[in-house]
Amino acid sequence: MSTLLIQLYILLALHGGESMDGYAPRYAPNVMERVVRHRDLPWAACNVSSAYYPVGTLVWVVSWNTHQVRQCRIADVSHPRAVARHRRTKRLIEAGYEEAKWICGLSHMRDRPERCPVTVIRVNEGG
């Protein structure tokens, strides 16, 4: 387990928030970039969609395929009719195509979401 991940779990214990395990399907190429432009969001190194959090929320994404941990901004949300299905199937985030390269790994880019396991951690403000 990385030092950063240990620190995140300590912050989670001290400040509250949540940690969820699930999967990360991906957007088609350039879709997330169009969403970010349409919403006029400032630049961020990582953008994802969520069925749990509003636009602008910062979360930490742990990739179990690539063993990387990065902070991502929620740049899009699930369509209201898709929220229940996304939650039921444990699709915690949807990654932009570029983000999916590090979240899922290049060898899993064409696989089903279940082949892209993630943990999403959100620490309460002040943490």
Language model feature labels by segment:
Residues 2-127:
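Secreted/periplasmic proteins
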